[in-house]
C-alpha cells in the first residue's frame, strides 16, 4: 500500500513537471512566432516606406510610376494591367495564351513563356476581393510583393530559430539581412522580377526542410514540414523559370547528407527529388570511406565533439558553400547566397551547442549557458545600436528618382506614333514602352528564349559597324516601324575593354583586330549609331529621324526607300 502511494505521488510529480515543461515550450513557441511575424511585418513596412521615398511613388502620375519598374520588369506589370482591363478573368487569360500584340510577327503563350502566374493570381484576388473600391491596382501589386518579402525574412527567422533553439538568432538574422539589403534583394528597383516573387517560396521551402531534417520533432510536425515543402517547391517551380537550377544545387546538398550517413535515409528519400541519384552516391561513397580506413559509425553525438546529430546544420553548411561558390562565379547569385549567410551566421553566434562542440574540438572548457545567453543579447543589441540609425537615415535622405527623357519619349509615342507601330530597341527599354504605351515590340527581356535572343542581337546591330542597308534589312525582317538608339549604349564608357555591347558586337561580327595584346575594332563602315546622326546618304535613304532628346534618338524605318545623294 505504501509503495502504491509513493508511486502515485511520484507520478503526479513527474506529470506536473512534464506539464510545466510543455507549457514553457508553448510559451516560447508563441513568443518566437510573434517575434517572427513582427519582424516580417516591420520589414514590409520599411520596404514600402523606402520604395515610396526613393521613387516618390505616391506623388507621381501613372506614367512616372510605371517607369520606376526597371530592368525590364515593367513587362510583367503590363500583363497584370491587361488582366484587370479584360472584361473577365477568363477572357484575359485566354488573350494571354494567344498573345499576338506583343512581339511583332509572332503569337506567343505569354503565361507559359514569361511565367505570369503571379500576375494571374494577383489580378484574380484583386477582382474577387473587390479591392478596386479602395486600393489602386499598382498599390495592390506592389503590396503583394512586399508581403512576400515579409514572408521571406520570416522564413529566415524560423530557419535560424529552429537550428539554434532561440528566437534571438532569428532577430539577429533579420537584422543582418536588412543591413545587407543591397546584396540580399533586388526589390528596391525592380519589383516585378520573377525572383522577387519566387525566392520567398524557396525560403519557406528551406525553412520547412530545416525542420524536416531535425531529429527532435514529432511525426505531426514532420508531416507538416513535408507538406509545406511540397507546396512551396511546386510554387517555386511554377513562378521562376530558373528554379530547377536552384533545386539541383539543393539536391546535391541532400545527396552529400545521405552519402555520408548524416541523415536517416527515410527522410532524404522523402524530401529529395533525385533520390535515385542519392542512392547511387551512397553505394559509391560508403565503400570508399571504409577502404580509406574510416569506421562505419553513423550515430554521431555532441559528446563526441561532432554535430552529426543535427543534420539540418550540416545541410546549411553545404547549402552555404555551394551557393557561395556560385556567387564567386556569377554576381547575380549573391542574392541567393547572402540571405542564408546572414541566417547561418546568426545561428552560429547564438547556438550554445555549436559553441560547446567548437570548444571540445579545440580542447577547451565549455562556457556556462548564462554566458552564452549574455553574449547573444550583446550581439543583437550591438548590431541594432550600430546599424539602426544608418538604416533609418536611408529613409530620410533619399534623392528623387526622375527620368525626364524617358517620360518625354513615352509621351511622344503615345501622342505621335501610330497605334499599330512596331518598335525596336534594347529589351529593357522595349519592356517599358510595352508597359506604358501598349505598342508592339521586336523583342523582350527574356534571356532563355533563343529566338528572342537572336532578334535582340539583330536589333543591337545599330550599335555595330554595319552598313545602312544591312541594318535596314535586319529591322524590316522584324516588321520594325521605328528604331530607338540609346546614347547610353552608343557612347558607353568602360574601363573593361571588350565588355561593352558594341565591343561584343564587333567580336561577333569579326570586326576586331588583335595587335600586341591590344584590341582594335576595324570595318569599312563606321559605327551605325554614330553615322546615322550625321544625317547624310545613304542613311537618310533608309531612315528618317522623327524624335530625339539627350538620351534617345528615334528613327522611322522608311517603307519606301528614297535615294538621295
Predicted features and spans:
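Start-transfer (signal-anchor) and selected internal transmembrane alpha helices
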Residues: 1-62, 68-72, 367-375
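Transmembrane-helix exit/juxtamembrane "anchor" motif
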Residues: 46-53, 213, 253-256, 260, ...
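Active-site lumenal/periplasmic loops and adjacent helix-entry segments of GT-C-fold
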Residues: 55-203, 209, 399
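Extracytoplasmic
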Residues: 72, 87, 361-565
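Membrane-embedded helix bundles of polyisoprenyl
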Residues: 97, 143-262, 266, 271-283, ...
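Transmembrane alpha-helix segments characteristic
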Residues: 274, 302-328, 341-344
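Membrane-proximal helix-loop-helix interfaces that form the catalytic/acceptor-binding platform
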Residues: 284-306
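Hydrophobic/aromatic-rich transmembrane helices and adjacent perimembrane loops
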Residues: 321-323, 327-370
Amino acid at each position: 500500500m505504501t509503495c502504491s502511494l509513493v508511486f502515485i505521488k511520484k507520478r503526479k510529480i513527474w506529470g506536473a513537471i512534464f506539464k510545466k515543461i510543455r507549457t514553457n515550450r508553448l510559451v516560447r513557441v508563441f513568443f518566437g512566432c510573434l517575434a517572427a511575424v513582427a519582424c516580417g511585418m516591420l520589414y514590409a513596412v520599411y520596404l514600402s516606406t523606402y520604395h515610396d521615398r526613393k521613387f516618390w511613388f505616391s506623388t507621381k502620375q501613372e506614367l512616372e510610376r510605371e517607369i520606376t519598374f526597371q530592368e525590364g520588369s515593367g513587362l510583367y506589370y503590363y500583363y497584370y494591367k491587361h488582366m484587370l482591363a479584360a472584361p473577365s478573368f477568363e477572357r484575359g487569360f485566354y488573350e494571354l495564351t494567344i498573345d499576338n500584340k506583343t512581339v511583332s510577327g509572332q503569337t506567343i503563350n505569354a503565361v507559359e513563356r514569361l511565367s505570369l502566374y503571379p500576375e494571374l493570381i494577383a489580378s484574380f484576388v484583386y477582382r474577387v476581393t473587390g479591392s478596386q473600391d479602395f486600393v489602386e491596382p499598382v498599390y495592390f501589386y506592389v503590396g503583394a510583393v512586399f508581403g512576400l518579402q515579409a514572408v521571406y525574412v520570416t522564413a529566415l527567422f524560423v530557419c535560424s530559430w529552429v537550428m539554434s533553439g532561440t528566437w534571438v538568432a532569428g532577430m539577429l538574422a533579420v537584422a543582418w539581412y536588412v543591413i545587407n539589403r543591397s546584396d540580399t534583394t533586388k526589390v528596391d528597383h525592380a519589383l516585378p522580377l520573377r525572383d522577387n516573387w519566387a525566392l520567398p517560396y524557396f525560403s519557406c521551402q528551406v525553412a520547412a526542410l530545416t525542420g524536416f531534417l531535425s531529429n527532435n520533432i514529432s511525426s505531426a510536425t514532420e508531416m507538416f514540414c513535408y507538406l509545406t515543402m511540397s507546396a512551396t517547391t511546386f510554387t517555386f517551380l511554377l513562378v521562376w523559370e530558373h528554379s530547377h537550377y536552384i533545386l539541383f544545387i539543393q539536391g546535391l546538398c541532400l545527396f552529400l547528407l545521405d552519402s555520408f550517413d548524416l541523415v536517416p535515409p527515410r527522410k532524404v528519400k522523402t524530401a529529395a527529388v533525385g533520390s535515385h541519384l542519392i542512392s547511387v552516391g551512397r553505394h559509391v561513397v560508403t565503400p570508399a570511406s571504409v577502404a580509406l580506413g574510416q569506421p562505419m559509425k553513423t550515430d554521431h553525438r555532441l559528446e563526441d565533439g561532432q554535430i552529426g546529430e543535427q543534420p539540418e546544420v550540416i545541410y546549411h553548411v553545404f547549402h552555404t558553400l555551394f551557393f557561395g561558390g556560385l556567387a564567386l562565379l556569377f554576381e547575380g547569385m549573391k542574392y541567393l547566397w547572402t540571405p542564408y549567410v546572414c541566417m547561418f551566421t546568426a545561428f552560429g553566434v547564438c547556438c550554445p551547442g555549436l559553441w560547446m562542440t567548437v570548444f571540445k574540438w579545440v580542447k577547451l572548457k565549455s562556457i556556462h549557458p548564462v554566458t552564452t545567453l549574455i553574449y547573444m543579447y550583446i550581439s543583437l543589441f550591438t548590431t541594432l545600436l550600430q546599424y539602426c540609425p544608418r538604416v533609418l537615415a536611408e529613409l530620410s535622405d533619399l534623392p528623387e528618382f526622375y527620368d525626364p527623357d524617358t517620360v518625354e519619349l513615352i509621351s511622344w509615342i503615345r501622342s505621335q506614333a501610330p497605334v499599330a507601330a512596331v518598335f525596336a530597341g534594347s529589351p529593357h527599354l522595349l519592356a517599358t514602352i510595352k508597359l506604358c504605351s501598349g505598342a508592339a515590340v521586336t523583342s523582350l527581356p527574356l534571356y532563355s528564349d533563343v529566338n528572342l535572343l537572336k532578334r535582340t542581337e539583330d536589333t543591337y546591330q545599330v550599335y555595330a559597324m554595319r552598313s545602312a542597308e544591312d541594318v535596314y534589312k535586319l529591322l524590316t525582317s522584324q516588321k520594325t516601324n521605328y528604331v530607338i538608339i540609346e546614347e547610353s549604349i552608343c557612347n558607353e564608357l568602360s574601363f573593361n575593354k571588350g565588355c561593352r555591347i558594341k565591343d561584343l558586337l564587333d567580336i561577333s561580327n569579326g570586326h576586331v583586330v588583335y595587335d600586341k595584346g591590344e584590341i582594335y575594332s576595324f570595318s569599312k563602315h563606321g559605327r551605325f549609331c554614330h553615322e546615322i546622326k550625321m544625317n547624310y546618304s545613304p542613311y537618310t535613304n533608309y531612315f528618317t529621324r522623327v524624335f530625339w532628346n539627350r538620351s534617345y534618338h528615334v528613327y522611322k524605318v522608311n517603307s519606301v526607300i528614297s535615294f538621295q545623294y
